Structures are given as C-alpha cells and as structure tokens.
Amino acid sequence: MSFNHQEIEKKWQGYWEENKTFRTPDETEKPKFYALDMFPYPSGAGLHVGHPEGYTATDILSRMKRMQGYNVLHPMGWDAFGLPAEQYALDTGNSPAEFTEHNINTFRNQIKSLGFSYDWDREVNTTDPNYYKWTQWIFLKLFEKGLAYVDEVPVNWCPALGTVLANEEIIDGKSERGGHPVERRPMRQWMLKITAYGDRLLEDLDELDWPESLKDMQRNWIGRSEGAEVHFNIDGTDEKFTVFTTRPDTLFGASYCVLAPEHALVADITTAEQKEAVEAYINSVKMKSDLERTELAKEKTGVFTGAYAVNPVNGEKLPIWIADYVLATYGTGAVMAVPAHDERDYEFASTFNLPMKEVVKGGDITKEAYTGDGEHVNSAFLDGLNKEEAIAKMIEWLEVTSAGNQKVTYRLRDWLFSRQRYWGEPIPVIHWEDGTMTAVKEEELPLVLPKTDNIRPSGTGESPLANIDEWVNVVDPETGKKGRRETNTMPQWAGSCWYYLRYIDPNNSEALVDPEKVKQWLPVDIYIGGAEHAVLHLLYARFWHKVLYDIGVVPTKEPFQQLFNQGMILGENNEKMSKSKGNVVNPDDIVASHGADTLRLYEMFMGPLDASIAWSENGLDGARRFLDRVWRLFVQDNGELSEKITDAPNKELEKAYHQTVKKVTEDYAELRFNTAISQMMVFINDAYKAETLPKEYVEGFVKMIAPVAPHIGEELWSKLGYNETITYASWPTFDESKLVEDEVEIVVQVMGKVRAKLTMSKDASKEEMEQLALEAIKDQIEGKTVRKVIVVPGKLVNVVAN
C-alpha cells in the first residue's frame, strides 16, 4: 500500500506552523549556518517548477545542518516593487499594492505547500514602509558620502511606458516588456558612484567561493584597464577634448579622432558645410541602444564634422569624425584612432578611406591591423622600444608636457538609480526654489509612498508622483522656503541589495540591523539562485555591502561566502518553459497528484543542480515509485511498522549502511543531491533483500531522506515511536572501519584459465588460499599431477597441473 501524501503533508505542515518548528533563536552556543535563497518577485503567474529547485537545495542543507547541531537561519521574503505590478495597475485600474499583496499570499501558500523549513517570523517585503525606511536610510548614507549625485545622462526613454529603461531591459531597440520603441535622450537622473568601489569589487572576488565563470562575468563587467589620458586641442579654437587609451605608445600613429554623436563639443565645432549631414546622423543614432551601437553593429557608420584636432606629440592635424560606436557614457566619449594597430579603427578607416600609419613593426597593415608587440618605428623618441617600454616613456612625456597623464578606467558605469515610475521607494530628497537640495531628515523616515488612483505617467518624464500636488509640494517650516520632493523612485534593485541583512533582525525599528546579531550571522554561508542575476544584483549588493562596511554597519567585507547557480528546468521538449509555448508545469498540480515530497525528490534527482534539464513525467512517476518502495519497506498495509525491523544487528547490511551515510553526508554538503539519492536507492534495494532490518539503520535512513522528503520523513519518524519532530534529531554517523572490505574475491586459474571465483577473508594466508583453491577445482585436476601453485595474496591462485 502506498502512503496518502495529501493527508501526511497537511498534517506535518500544520504541526510545523503550530509549533514554530523552524523558528531561529538569536542567542545560542551552537555554530551558525545561514542559507539564503534569492527571494522571488511575486508575479501574477505564481510559483513555477523552477523556483523549488533552488529552494529545495537550500532546504536540504538547512535541515541537515540543524541535525548536525547548527543554529540555522533560513528565511524567505518578497522582492515586491517593480514594473509588472505597475503595468497591471495601469491596465486594470487596480492598485499595485493590492495586486502585490494578493500575489504574495498566493506565493506564500504555494511555498508552504512544498514543506520548506523557513522561519516565517523573519519574512520581509521590500514594499513595506518599515522595510523601505532602511532602504531610504542607506540612500541617505550614500548621499552623505557623495556616492549619490544628480547628473544629466543620455538614457533609454520609452515613450509608451513613460519611463527610462536600463540597457538590459531593451531587446533590438524595443522594450523587453511590450515591445515598444525606445529612443535616447538626455535627462536629469540620480546616479550611484559604484565606480568608486571598482578596485575593491574586483580584488575581493578572489576571496569568494563562487564559480569561476561567474567571477569572470563580474570581472569583465567591471572591466578595469590601465593606460593614459591624452588632451587634444581643436585647431583654430580654444576648445579641447580628452581621450583615454590603453596604447599611448601608438600616439604617433593617430590619423583621425572620433567623438560620440552626443558629445557636448559636436555642435560647437561642426562647420557650416557639414552641419546638415552631422544633424541627420545624430537623429539616426537616437533610436539605437548602446548594445546595437557597439557589439551588434555590423558595419561602421560616421560623419566628418569639418573640424581638426592637433596631435600633441607631433602637431599633425587629425580630422574629427562622429560615429555611433563611440558612446558618450563610456570613457570620455572621444577616441584617438590608430587604424594600423586597432581592429575597430582599421574597419572605420577602410570604410571611409582614411590614412593609416604604421608605428609598430610586425604585421602587414595593407591586409589587417597589427595589434601585437614589436619594435616602434616612425615614432621619434619611441623608436626601437617595445610596447611596455614605449607606453612607460610616452606616459612620462605626456605628464612632463602636461599633454596627458597615467589613468585607470573601468568598463563599469555609475549606476543609474532613478526610475520615472510610481511603484518604487520614494527618493528622500527635496529640491528647493533657490536651486539647493537637501535630504529628508533621518527621523522623518520612512518617506511613505502616497496612495493614489492616478498612476499614469506624467508625460513630462517625471514619475506619476509629480501629479500629487499635496505630496510633492513642501514648505520649509523654519524659513518658509518652497520646495518640491524628488519625484523619481528607486529601481527594483534597491530593496534586493540588502534584504539578507534585514532577515537577521527583521523587526528592529531603531537600526537597520543590531550590530551583535549581524556579527553572529554574517557572512551568508550559501546563496543559491538563478544565473540571470550573476552580474547586476550581485554586483549592486556587494557595492552596498562595502559602503555599509565602511560606515561600520556590517563586520565583513563581503556578503556571500559561497554562491551557487542552479540550472534551468526546461519543458519536456527541451525548450524554455513559457506560457506562449503552453509547456509550463504548475507545482500546485504536482503537489496534488504526486505530493510535495515527490516533487522535491524528483527535482533533486533530475541531474546535477547546475545543469539545465528537461522536465519528464516519467521521471516524476519514478520518484513517486521510489518513495512508495521506501514506505512499503518500513510500513505494513495495516499502518504498523514492518516486522522485518528488529533491534538485532545485521552484518550483511552493515557495510551498505555506513557507505550510504558517508556518501549522503558528503554529497549533500557538496550539493550533489542526485548522487546522494542514487546511493539511498542502492541501500533500499539491499534492504529489500535482507532478512531483517536493524532499527538503527532504519532510523538513520529516515534521517537522511527527511531533508529531501520531509513529510514522509516526519511520518516514518513518528511510526518509529518518536513523539517530537525529526528536525532536531542528531544526524547519523558512519564508521570508516566498517567501509573497509573484510572479504575479497579470489580468481582460481588452472594453467592460466579461470576455473573458479572464491570469496574469502582478505587476511587469508597463502596456505589457506591454496587449500581453498584446490578444494574448489578438485574436479578439474582429478588424475593430474599438481606441478606448482602460484599464490598472489588477495588476488589469485594459479595451479599448474598436467
């Protein structure tokens, strides 16, 4: 008979809730273990089968660690601000807060139905004013340190959505959400100076136990490069511009310069003859995203401005072009072009028939750019030097003549922190009529998002908050000065930058987190989530953490010691699950038909945790069959414990049991859940063949399967006679000496041909081996004379007889 999953799951979920089984105490002598999941955005679609994969992994670890005597912090919460709720509100007229609350309730019920051991007393919600009070507090600290500032920046403006979009939210020049056209326009935006932390964000990666591929993604995103800034005067004017180059040694080979179309100097330096062509080109660029302008651009485009720059090193006049592959937001928005030694410059020069001048020997510039090292030529005081020597000498010359200086730059840009939306944290700043701006006082936080029915975009580029006069207009009570509140809101990234800290002390109204508690719990021991957050979320969270470290709020330099990305669960046809393809699997249906324990077991058994694997109904059925086999082995049809279970030891199961404890313990710790489950299956097969089952082994097995299948684990534990939960029972241990083979298989040969195989003690003497071997093959050697017996201890006996 199989078990009734619906009955058992309801029973134990009720028990855990009533007894607060997973409540994490703060004061404890035990060692700590902090297991963190990337908290979900509570969408209208509810939980999908991809969510529980990572959640089950952290839950198995959390449950094992509790049994190993750790105090475990394993929390859950909601990343609940964001565009979808606002779009829904615009489309339906309902409030984003109601929509979000409804979705959170659905998600919470779904997550609870899967039996995860979260401490729900620590639940956080980024849209709760008691939570975002501290998101705003962190913003004030950034503002005080000069790390939050206002700037005019070219942004991706989407008229249909009425907001600015990040590069990542744009695909092929259209918004990812809704497919609306996007254009570039300069706007006043809040920026966070993440670049000030570039070196530390880069260097501290070395100390982390993260996948190397993920560290590389962060390193590339930060993109540190060393080189020089060079100042170019514009011929016939007092104007100048600066370029950054990693190859100042090639300055003698510069043959033209390129400015970004948005560069502030373009309008001033363009000649009357070129004005029309330049303006037409600038307009054509407005519709392109940064990605389309750089990495996706198939051919180089550009226009000559009519102006010339003066090369500081030799006085040569270099034509100034504009081209979309140079971005105003990257570097200085200007480049010196050395087509003989740079592939991109070479393509551009070839397209527009611009001159090339070789200054490093080693290639054939009639065929392609030469970017390697070599002897410098046509370079006056650099002639004969190699690349490294020439770079050092040129930087020295630039600094002596004030024509430039040594410089380190980053690919990393400052973080565009404002959104023209309603559903986000208000930025606690007031702009006064005299042009000054001040932060809201700490004691006035949280600055609460006002309730309103009118969340349509203002159309001016400001957020819908600009429509709420009574909220936006303020008067200074001391001076009578008038002001307006900042109407931009924070991006969804803000609340998720620090949520792992709030779980440590979720109800503290006096501080972001208690210093003693944060010292106890940090760093997070393991953080599991999807690879789609590999760069931005993790980089932003590390940045905020370092700022909090600098002001003494947190005691560690890094937030997450170990990080792991789970793979994706694909549809049965190996395609990504999506509503449009109709291949989405709803976990609620599986919980109803097969049970939560089966879903958890199946997702862990599908394959390695970091692999992307297709969903399979057959695999799901197989997982349920295994749990049924476990149940039937231990429980009779009448619900009583199997009569095979006894207090007596069983030598034939001893080795299999100790092997299983060792492998499961090690595999769980290393996140190799699929192989741990395989080993448990092997043990159950052995146990079915055994005459009796020692109770000690049954209890040990139940403890091992409980982290994966907690409901059946609890039910079997109670059937074994225990009144309290299995949660804090002690984890089984193994004896290394029991893993050693006592017996070995010996091959018996006659004249070199195998005639028998014998099992005997591994310590058997040569005499014993010979005696047993001759006994086993006496039929084969009857009537023959044994000339010689060769014995290899522990391996074989070869009999020479004729």
From Swiss-Prot:
<keyword id="KW-0648">Protein biosynthesis</keyword>
<keyword id="KW-0436">Ligase</keyword>
<comment type="similarity">
    <text>Belongs to the class-I aminoacyl-tRNA synthetase family.</text>
</comment>
<dbReference type="Pfam" id="PF00133">
    <property type="entry name" value="tRNA-synt_1"/>
</dbReference>
<keyword id="KW-0547">Nucleotide-binding</keyword>
<dbReference type="InterPro" id="IPR002302">
    <property type="entry name" value="Leu-tRNA-ligase"/>
</dbReference>
<dbReference type="InterPro" id="IPR015413">
    <property type="entry name" value="Methionyl/Leucyl_tRNA_Synth"/>
</dbReference>
<dbReference type="Pfam" id="PF13603">
    <property type="entry name" value="tRNA-synt_1_2"/>
</dbReference>
<keyword id="KW-0067">ATP-binding</keyword>
<dbReference type="GO" id="GO:0005524">
    <property type="term" value="F:ATP binding"/>
</dbReference>
<dbReference type="GO" id="GO:0006429">
    <property type="term" value="P:leucyl-tRNA aminoacylation"/>
</dbReference>
<dbReference type="InterPro" id="IPR009080">
    <property type="entry name" value="tRNAsynth_Ia_anticodon-bd"/>
</dbReference>
<dbReference type="InterPro" id="IPR025709">
    <property type="entry name" value="Leu_tRNA-synth_edit"/>
</dbReference>
<feature type="binding site">
    <location>
        <position position="579"/>
    </location>
    <ligand>
        <name>ATP</name>
    </ligand>
</feature>
<dbReference type="GO" id="GO:0004823">
    <property type="term" value="F:leucine-tRNA ligase activity"/>
</dbReference>
<protein>
    <recommendedName>
        <fullName>Leucine--tRNA ligase</fullName>
        <ecNumber>6.1.1.4</ecNumber>
    </recommendedName>
</protein>
<dbReference type="GO" id="GO:0002161">
    <property type="term" value="F:aminoacyl-tRNA deacylase activity"/>
</dbReference>
<feature type="short sequence motif" description="'KMSKS' region">
    <location>
        <begin position="576"/>
        <end position="580"/>
    </location>
</feature>
<dbReference type="Pfam" id="PF08264">
    <property type="entry name" value="Anticodon_1"/>
</dbReference>
<dbReference type="GO" id="GO:0005829">
    <property type="term" value="C:cytosol"/>
</dbReference>
<dbReference type="InterPro" id="IPR014729">
    <property type="entry name" value="Rossmann-like_a/b/a_fold"/>
</dbReference>
<keyword id="KW-0030">Aminoacyl-tRNA synthetase</keyword>
<keyword id="KW-0963">Cytoplasm</keyword>
<dbReference type="InterPro" id="IPR013155">
    <property type="entry name" value="M/V/L/I-tRNA-synth_anticd-bd"/>
</dbReference>
<feature type="short sequence motif" description="'HIGH' region">
    <location>
        <begin position="40"/>
        <end position="51"/>
    </location>
</feature>
<dbReference type="InterPro" id="IPR009008">
    <property type="entry name" value="Val/Leu/Ile-tRNA-synth_edit"/>
</dbReference>
<dbReference type="Pfam" id="PF09334">
    <property type="entry name" value="tRNA-synt_1g"/>
</dbReference>
<dbReference type="InterPro" id="IPR001412">
    <property type="entry name" value="aa-tRNA-synth_I_CS"/>
</dbReference>
<dbReference type="InterPro" id="IPR002300">
    <property type="entry name" value="aa-tRNA-synth_Ia"/>
</dbReference>
